[in-house]
Amino acid sequence: MNWSIFEGLLSGVNKYSTAFGRIWLSLVFIFRVLVYLVTAERVWSDDHKDFDCNTRQPGCSNVCFDEFFPVSHVRLWALQLILVTCPSLLVVMHVAYREVQEKRHREAHGENSGRLYLNPGKKRGGLWWTYVCSLVFKASVDIAFLYVFHSFYPKYILPPVVKCHADPCPNIVDCFISKPSEKNIFTLFMVATAAICILLNLVELIYLVSKRCHECLAARKAQAMCTGHHPHGTTSSCKQDDLLSGDLIFLGSDSHPPLLPDRPRDHVKKTIL
């Protein structure tokens, strides 16, 4: 594995995340990915070999193991971590796409032409929706996998002994699980970290939506103030002052704010794409 590429992806995800997103990223890669890589394979490496049943009937142990462990914990966690981390990489790819588009625009129209994005990494327009959808997807994946784990293993606990009566077992046999206490501790740790990640995703989602609503209300308030000061529709001077002070917020697409004839482009200070 090329760790330099991996480090670059992590730094990109961290750069374009909020404070809640950075905490989530640290929690995932320190308390979930690293713990999984260091511990999970060792704890579950001998689960099938050491699954003993008090019978010599050929095939009985294999059938009972498949009945009580339809999907391995390790495989489920691996799939969960892959699905949880991919949306964050999509945000980085979206920013990279914006930067490429901005570069091509400058090459085609010159350095003095208008910019497509005032800040390609700022969460505005399509990038805002990409980030929000990634939060919803990550929380949904963790919730779905917690439900799957609970369905396969009630209360996420493995009993030390299970009773099996599946064919070809001659009767009800007792089967013994290897290292149940260690596996239970590790399982509960992974469940707890997944629950904390879900909470962080929901808090970050609420933060982003409330921030966007606040910006929309501020923009409408600014427009209402301009209309109140100029009841006859002559609002250009008011908009000029708002542009100079950086208070007027433009919502919607990634286009530039309208340029006014008596002010140069350099005075436009804040634009929401």
Swiss-Prot record:
Q: Which family does it belong to?
A: Belongs to the connexin family. Beta-type (group I) subfamily.
- For this protein, the parts annotated as crossing the membrane are 21-40, 76-98, 127-149, 188-210
Q: Which GO terms describe its biological process?
A: cell-cell signaling; epidermis development; labyrinthine layer morphogenesis; trophoblast giant cell differentiation
Location of the protein in the cell: Cell membrane; Cell junction, Gap junction
Q: Which Gene3D superfamilies match?
A: Gap junction channel protein cysteine-rich domain
Q: Which protein is depicted?
A: Gap junction beta-5 protein
UniProt keyword list: Cell junction, Cell membrane, Gap junction, Membrane, Transmembrane, Transmembrane helix
Q: Which domain of life is it from?
A: Eukaryota
A Gene Ontology cellular-component term: connexin complex
**Membrane-protein topology:** Multi-pass membrane protein
Q: Which residues lie on this side of the membrane: Extracellular?
A: 41-75, 150-187
What exactly does this protein do? Answer: One gap junction consists of a cluster of closely packed pairs of transmembrane channels, the connexons, through which materials of low MW diffuse from one cell to a neighboring cell.
Which PROSITE patterns does its entry note? CONNEXINS_1, CONNEXINS_2
Oligomer and partners = A connexon is composed of a hexamer of connexins.
The signal peptide stretch is none
Its main subcellular localisation, reduced to a broad class, is membrane
Extract the GO molecular function terms from the UniProt entry: gap junction channel activity
What is the gene name?
GJB5
Q: Which residues lie on this side of the membrane: Cytoplasmic?
A: 1-20, 99-126, 211-273
Q: Which organism is it from?
A: Homo sapiens (Human)
